[in-house]
């Protein structure tokens, strides 16, 4: 297989007149937060004060490419082919981001409150951290080497799941 390092690139964005320079950014997370979401959180750590609010993330700092097998074979292999890192070089959050972010605030989602409502546990904890710089409760990071299971595999659905149960397994 050919080395693809020649395809690496860096793009620097220029500030725009309407740009904001946030002091703190809170990301609402669950144990199903993975992949591109974790990449964004990890990337922002190099540039801003960041917190995850909710629970520890899944831990997937890698990406995949698809490889089709021979023309007569319908199979496709999806292989882990790259690892992501932020501008500071942080990359090994295989057990979730709680151990690698400076602030990891534990909070529960309040499904009865509208998204963004200060009565919602996640929103409330995020606003507290943004306003004070402190977490009322801290997420305990995963034990190193502990296997994680997919969120969907842990939460069975009822026979006739509501929209909330379908989109947020484990909420029943």
Each model region followed by its residue ranges:
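C-terminal "post-core" interaction segments
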Residues: 1-172
